[in-house]
Amino acid sequence: MPNFKSTAPKAKFAIYNNSNPDSESGFVEFQGYSFGAPVSCSGEAVFTTSLVGYPESMTDPSYKGQILVFTQPLIGNYGVPSGEERDDFNLLKYLESPHIHVRGIVVAEYAWRYSHWTAVESLATWCQRENVTAIGGIDTRAVVQILREQGSSPSTITVQGSFIPKPIKPETDLVKIVSTKKPFFVKALSSVKTPFNVALIDCGVKENIIRCLVERGANVTVFPYDYPITSVANQFDGIFISNGPGDPVQCMESTVPELKKLLETNTLQDLPIFGICLGHQLLALASGGKTIKLGYGNRAHNIPALDLTTGQCHITSQNHGYAVDVDTLPESGFKPFFQNLNDKSNEGMIHVSRPIFSTQFHPEAKGGPRDSAVLFDRYFDNMSQYRALKGPKVKLTLNTSSLATERVF
């Protein structure tokens, strides 16, 4: 077998001190080789312990602007599936969005040869085509120890022959970047006689979240993150708030005020609402709660979350660096729904009297376990009750036939 590694360009991965990223001595550097685009990059270094699912993770908008470290020792061995193939709902069949969102990836060992029946190209070719930096030959165990101790950190990947990047702080308008620029419409299958109508607030939604809604019999209208959702909410059977990247306070002047208005509208008190990940955090902020930054976040496919209402443990898929401060939730409104059994952080909240709940983890889980996919069924049960209560009063008058059928960038 040819020694591809020996001919690959040399590269360096540097992790900077959180307290003083501009210091020339305040960093740890690792030597490796480049197998992605021949460009250097900088971003916030985070790590995932997921064993599989690198194509899904790299196309998850929640990772926008970050450098993703994989703890799985060998990455790339099953290649990359088609980014064009779509399912019956016109959703991407294998990826979570049309393009890679991570700024760079760090692996211990890159698999120069791949094999899988869905693969159409190698991970290296994909990264090069998408202009994404990728470095291999890195001691990722040592990297994770650093990130575990000092938290998610400014970092750089420098490729031989490319410019030398400077560490930068996380961007602040990430949701604005990844959100659809105009509403689009995803239709349920024609075999569904009376589909529900869901308004989805796109803060960086994954394809599989939309799929989990439409495959259960919902027509989904996806709106930009800053859309005045209250103006159309009475036309829908439910509101959904998606996942997304970055600090939730970046949406304090956009999504949060709209959600607050939605929660306070008297005629919409019975309207079902479901939020996931960033959507959970934004719902908490709109309700008067606060969020906190975690040291190194939770990014894995095997994190136990306890349902505080039943005592049942769910094994969950997670990807977040912030969490809701459960002690700041208003006593008269929400109560904790799930708790992380590893670090005891909040994993969800549920309203004491209204059909509203949210989770920090990803029940749609692609990749990852499907233990908590039943939460989508619970959401649909809430919409069934809402439809029975409101009857013909809830009618979609928005002209969905004039909308796009996929994300608008």
Curated annotation (Swiss-Prot):
Keywords: Amino-acid biosynthesis, Arginine biosynthesis, ATP-binding, Cytoplasm, Glutamine amidotransferase, Ligase, Nucleotide-binding. Gene3D superfamilies: 3.40.50.880, Carbamoyl-phosphate synthase small subunit, N-terminal domain. GO terms for molecular function: ATP binding; carbamoyl-phosphate synthase (glutamine-hydrolyzing) activity; glutaminase activity. It catalyses: hydrogencarbonate + L-glutamine + 2 ATP + H2O = carbamoyl phosphate + L-glutamate + 2 ADP + phosphate + 2 H(+). Its main location: cytoplasm. Heterodimer composed of 2 chains; the small (or glutamine) chain promotes the hydrolysis of glutamine to ammonia, which is used by the large (or ammonia) chain to synthesize carbamoyl phosphate. Small subunit of the arginine-specific carbamoyl phosphate synthase (CPSase). CPSase catalyzes the formation of carbamoyl phosphate from the ammonia moiety of glutamine, carbonate, and phosphate donated by ATP, constituting the first step of 2 biosynthetic pathways, one leading to arginine and/or urea and the other to pyrimidine nucleotides. The small subunit (glutamine amidotransferase) binds and cleaves glutamine to supply the large subunit with the substrate ammonia. This is Carbamoyl phosphate synthase arginine-specific small chain.
